[in-house]
Amino acid sequence: MKTYEDLEGDGGSNIIGQVVQLGEKLRSRLDKIKHKVALMSGKGGVGKSSITANIASCLADRGYKVGILDADLNGPSIGHLLGVGNELKLETKNEGIEPGNGHQGIKIMSMDMLLKSADTPVMWTEEANATAVWVSTMESTAIRELLADTNWGELDYLLIDMPPGSDRIDNIRSLIPELAGAVEITIPSMLSQHFVTKSITKNNKMGVPIIGLVENMATYVCPHCEKEGKLFAGEDVQKLTERKEIPYIGKIPFDTRVSQSKSGNLFYS
């Protein structure tokens, strides 16, 4: 049996050429996109995807060309929020896979659009004992392919809806060295602020610019009198941003009308 050292060349696979070609393909896509911004949260359930969709909508309203990459591979929701579900039949052309066109012409690529049905889970392997390293490698490869194979065209902004936590920013930064920065999203609960602080610290150590922090569900809007009240007890989020020396972008109230809206119409006017 031959060992790895006994092999001559690459066996005809031209693996180096393939890697170079993949890198050039990704680079050609990204070069047509002016600004790439990651939307992050320390934990789930803070409304990150809804805010991503609303930011994209606001940018589109101002005449910018916008795309969203749903990087939350195991819990994709951007397609649903913007009216593009898994019923969309993706079309492959010479230029690549055509992204879904959501609300206001926002270009979308999401794992949700690649699944057979709405209740189909993302399964990276049939092996029950698959290691975390193996799954993480497959996730990283999937992100690269979604970025490189999608025909984004020329965009002013590509928003990247990240999964909860701070560990996946490593993959995004390696794929997009020119990442403009990250927008952190939190709710004013002590637990959420605990995790978003970790995310901020991680980005600072990695040199990822923090564009600012959005405080979601800052208050509760009464559906009857429209008065606002506090929902959570925690540190004042503005003080948190001052302590971490990052911009405070603003706060958004918890509004039940958003949850009552239909898919593709979850936007503030």
Give the ranges of each region predicted by the language model.
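Walker A/P-loop phosphate-binding motif and the immediately C-terminal alpha-helix
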Residues: 35-73, 200
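Short glycine/serine/threonine-rich phosphate/pyrophosphate-binding segments
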Residues: 48-54, 75-79, 162-171, 192-195
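Phosphate-binding loop that captures ATP/GTP phosphates
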Residues: 65-66, 71-121
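Phosphate-binding P-loop
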Residues: 28-34
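Residue-level signature of catalytic and energy-coupling elements of molecular machines
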Residues: 33, 44, 70, 78, ...
